[in-house]
Swiss-Prot record:
PANTHER family: ANTITERMINATION NUSB DOMAIN-CONTAINING PROTEIN, N UTILIZATION SUBSTANCE PROTEIN B-RELATED. Keywords: RNA-binding, Transcription, Transcription antitermination, Transcription regulation. The gene is nusB. GO terms for molecular function: RNA binding. Belongs to the NusB family. GO terms for cellular component: cytosol. It holds the Pfam family NusB. CDD domains: Terminator_NusB. It comes from Aquifex aeolicus (strain VF5). Involved in transcription antitermination. Required for transcription of ribosomal RNA (rRNA) genes. Binds specifically to the boxA antiterminator sequence of the ribosomal RNA (rrn) operons. This is Transcription antitermination protein NusB. GO terms for biological process: DNA-templated transcription termination; transcription antitermination. Signal peptide: none annotated.
Length: 148
């Protein structure tokens, strides 16, 4: 599953451009795939799945993120941080990734690549809190997802 790191990068760029430019995510996906010259079918399909999931659940994803920002609104986040968190929540919570450690590493690496180390630590902290609340909390009472 080595292709997934590249797929995450592709999906991140699509979400980033969608947030920044407000254009059709499907068209942006085609644009990024062409720019990156993606030939690997698995990478293409996984990136598409990530983008489709994030776009389909964007309101819920933003609500989940907002609950864990502690005094911040999602609109105050930079484009890199906001869209890295969206991608992470889509994959960890909605797609229920079987490799959460790898997702965390790749998401934080994306933030460091496109922003900086401090932003990477911030995203890691917020994503960890979300993951703990939705996945690793005891089975007593987890926050619910409307789409389930």
């Amino acid at each position: 599953m080595r292709y997934r790191k590249g797929a995450r990068d592709t999906a991140f760029l699509v979400l980033y451009r969608w947030d920044l430019r407000g254009e059709n995510p499907g068209e942006l996906f085609k644009e990024v795939v062409e720019e990156k010259n993606i030939k690997n079918k698995d990478a293409y399909e996984y990136a598409k799945k990530l983008v489709d999931t994030a776009v389909r659940h964007i309101e819920e994803i933003d609500s989940i993120i907002e609950k864990h920002l502690k005094g911040w609104s999602i609109d105050r986040l930079g484009y890199v941080e906001r869209n890295a968190l969206r991608l992470g929540v889509a994959e960890l919570i909605f797609l229920k990734s079987k490799e959460p450690g790898r997702v965390f590493i790749d998401i934080v690496d994306l933030v460091k690549k496109y922003a900086d180390e401090k932003a990477g630590k911030f995203v890691n902290g917020v994503l960890s809190a979300i993951y703990k609340a939705y996945i690793t909390s005891s089975k007593e009472e987890k926050p619910s997802l409307k789409s389930e």
